[in-house]
């Protein structure tokens, strides 16, 4: 659960930072695949960012942990992220 909360907070910090002009579609795709996709689809979504092997391995370990959460929990994390990103605080 701590990992999920950490991931959600990091995601929100990145998406709501004043430096971001909007949500990077590629980043949103990676997060969606991290939470709801298959390990293969997640790995494929990372390729365009050219992570090194250590980064890929860390991401796959996080994917395995997140996949142990119930589907509805992962869907609700996505909904929460979308709600926060669309709030006036992130505009």
UniProtKB/Swiss-Prot annotation:
Single Gene Ontology BP annotation: signal transduction
GO molecular function: phospholipase A2 inhibitor activity; steroid binding
SMART domains in the record: UTG
Keyword Metal-binding among record annotations: no
UniProt entry keywords in alphabetical sequence: Disulfide bond, Lipid-binding, Phospholipase A2 inhibitor, Secreted, Signal, Steroid-binding
Signal peptide, first to last residue: 1-21
Protein origin, superkingdom: Eukaryota
PROSITE patterns in alphabetical order: SCGB
Main subcellular location of this protein, as a coarse class: secreted
Keyword Disulfide bond: yes
InterPro entries (UniProt xref): Secretoglobin (IPR016126), Secretoglobin_1C-like (IPR043215), Secretoglobin_sf (IPR035960), Uteroglobin (IPR000329)
GO cellular component: cytoplasm; extracellular space
Location in or out of the cell: Secreted
Family the entry assigns: Belongs to the secretoglobin family.
Quaternary structure annotation from Swiss-Prot or TrEMBL: Antiparallel homodimer; disulfide-linked. Interaction with LMBR1L is controversial.
Biological function: Uteroglobin binds progesterone specifically and with high affinity. It may regulate progesterone concentrations reaching the blastocyst. It is also a potent inhibitor of phospholipase A2.
Name of the protein in question: Uteroglobin
Organism (species): Lepus capensis
Designated gene of the protein: SCGB1A1
